[in-house]
């Protein structure tokens, strides 16, 4: 690593005993830091941090060394800004927080406009670059809460003095709590990239991280896999592929190729590891249009659970230019536990993706778009053997019967089990489902699908479903409180599930239907919610039920 500083102006320190660092200077190469590493003979990746301290700054160089046989994915090349400025910011939450590599879920502070007052739109965020590397695309990461970008203009410049910005495009990130990706028509050696944010959730502007990338067009692993498999999802073997070609793959993919070739891929594992994921509508956009609370965007469960630190391989087929990501959902709360409405998000690109899980939970595919677009097509994704644990889920449209539900529930091992109906999803404690409804779910899911449908009909919004909007309500089973409704979720305390999942119990006591319908009514009441009527106007829906 070269530097323009003299040897005496900087120092280096590290603790790992499997690498060596030396400060050197030669006539040909000038002053530089040489890093050499020993062979990794272990079975897992190892990481070391090298601290370089100078009179002007301190830098940390992270060295990752993979084990023999470990899957090495050549990702795209991250381009880090050299600086930046924003038109306004809350103290301690300036633009530097958006390119420090730290997310709010890790305890870091995001960028945020001043609290307690509306942002002075348009809010500008400007990023500086050396201009020596092409930038092909960028990813805007949101935080959970106010400030998610709505409408935004993106400008670039290649001038050394960062003048004469050129408009690259106008976008609508729809104020959603999900990453947004902007791809340029061609790579730009930008010296500056400027965002002009015209609107934001709650009249604020925030940004967790802003990442910039050069596309890596020389992905050796992708090319190697396509000598054996028919496409990058690795679900079918090409005709006339030899065993020698298969054995030449990394060990991880040898096992996959052999399972596909020999038809030994476990049927249950395969059902959830290889799936086509449907597009769903944008919840923020339709909540605004239909005057409702936000439905859930967790419409696409994978049925796969993970633990913190797991390395997960995700093979993504043609995305048709759509942006998709993976979200890991676990729990929140101190007084009592309940399912979180959002979690760590990992962007997905076509091809081989390798994700390191920050925390435990179940994985959901985030695929939200305009349903009327001709590119809103199902996307094939393969989460191969060895990546996470299959827990499964029950889908009414796909699995159809109580017998299949009972089979899937008994095979599941995670704390929570997901049931997807037409209009509502249950994400409930597995042990409570085994206690109350171990063998039958159809009566419950049909009942609550109907109740949601009746409320939508009463609102007069059933005509746009599912052609334009198709998100589900998402019911969870908190370990405290009673019943409630909010954006993204409705909650029914886990000790009460028997009263809403067993049709006889629902019909036996008025409150067993009225109470949940009252909470679902909170989701739909905005158009009739007069002042001081929050706990009564929604009863129009529960009385209708």
Model-predicted regions and their roles:
Residues 3-34:
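Surface-exposed binding patches on compact interaction domains or structured appendages
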Residues 405-411, 415-545:
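Catalytic cores of extracellular degradative/oxidative enzymes
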Residues 104-123, 170-176, 286-295:
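Extracellular beta-rich ligand/substrate-recognition surface
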Residues 69-130, 143-148, 216-224:
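Disordered, acidic Ser/Thr/Pro-rich linker "stalks" and the adjacent N-terminal cap
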Residues 228-392:
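Beta-strand-enriched, solvent-exposed domains that form extended recognition/catalytic surfaces
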Residues 121-122, 144-217:
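Trp- and acidic/polar-enriched beta-sheet ligand-binding modules for extracellular glycan
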Residues 44-55:
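A short beta-strand micro-motif common to beta-rich folds, especially ectodomain repeats
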Residues 120-122, 130-137, 189-190, 306-312:
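Extended extracellular/luminal ectodomain segments enriched in beta-structured repeat modules
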């Amino acid at each position: 690593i070269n530097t323009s500083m003299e040897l005496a102006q900087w120092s280096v320190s590290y603790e790992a005993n499997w690498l060596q660092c030396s400060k050197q200077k030669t006539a040909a190469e000038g002053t530089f830091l040489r890093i050499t590493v020993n062979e990794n003979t272990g079975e897992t990746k190892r990481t070391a941090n090298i601290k370089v301290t100078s009179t002007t700054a301190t830098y940390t160089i992270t060295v990752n060394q993979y084990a023999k046989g470990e899957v090495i994915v050549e990702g795209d090349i991250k381009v880090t800004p050299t600086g930046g400025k924003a038109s306004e910011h809350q103290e301690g939450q300036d633009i530097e927080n958006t390119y420090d590599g730290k997310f709010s879920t890790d305890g870091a502070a995001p960028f945020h406009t001043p609290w307690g007052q509306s942002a002075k739109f348009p809010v500008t965020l400007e990023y500086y670059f050396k201009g020596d590397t092409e930038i092909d695309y960028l990813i805007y990461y949101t935080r959970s809460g106010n400030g998610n970008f709505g409408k935004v203009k993106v400008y670039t410049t290649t001038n050394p003095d960062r003048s004469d910005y050129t408009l690259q495009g106008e976008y609508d990130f729809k104020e959603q709590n999900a990453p947004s990706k902007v791809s340029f028509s061609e790579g730009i050696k930008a010296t500056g990239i400027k965002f002009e944010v015209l609107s934001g959730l709650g009249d604020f502007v925030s940004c967790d991280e802003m990442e910039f990338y050069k596309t890596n067009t020389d992905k050796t692993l992708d090319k190697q896999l396509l000598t054996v498999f028919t496409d990058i999802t690795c679900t079918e073997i090409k005709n006339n592929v030899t065993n020698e070609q298969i054995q030449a793959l990394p060990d991880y993919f040898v096992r996959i190729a052999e399972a596909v070739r020999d038809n030994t891929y476990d049927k249950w594992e395969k059902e959830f590891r290889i799936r086509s994921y449907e597009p769903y509508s944008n919840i923020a956009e339709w909540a605004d249009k239909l005057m409702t609370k936000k439905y859930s965007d967790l419409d696409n469960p994978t049925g796969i659970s993970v633990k913190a630190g797991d390395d997960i391989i995700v093979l993504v087929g043609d995305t048709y230019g759509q942006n998709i990501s993976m979200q890991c959902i676990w729990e929140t709360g101190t007084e009592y536990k309940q399912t979180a409405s959002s979690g760590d998000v990992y962007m997905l690109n076509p091809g081989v993706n390798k994700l390191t899980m920050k925390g435990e939970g179940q994985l959901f595919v985030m695929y939200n778009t305009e349903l009327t677009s001709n590119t809103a097509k199902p996307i094939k994704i393969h989460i191969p053997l060895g990546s996470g644990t299959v827990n499964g889920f029950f889908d009414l449209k796909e699995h159809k019967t109580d017998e299949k539900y009972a089979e899937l529930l008994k095979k599941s091992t995670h704390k929570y089990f997901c049931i997807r109906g037409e209009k509502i999803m249950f994400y409930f404690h597995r042990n409570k489902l085994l206690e109350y409804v171990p063998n039958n779910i159809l009566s419950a899911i049909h009942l609550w699908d109907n109740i949601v449908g009746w409320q939508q009909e009463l609102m007069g919004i059933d005509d746009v479903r599912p052609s334009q909007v198709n998100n589900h309500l998402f019911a969870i089973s908190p370990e405290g409180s009673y019943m409630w409704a909010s954006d993204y979720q409705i909650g029914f305390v886990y000790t009460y599930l028997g009263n809403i999942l067993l049709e006889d119990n629902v019909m036996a006591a008025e409150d067993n239907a009225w109470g949940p319908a009252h909470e679902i009514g909170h989701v739909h009441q905005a158009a009739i919610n007069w002042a001081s009527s929050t706990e009564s106007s929604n009863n129009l829906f529960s009385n209708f039920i």
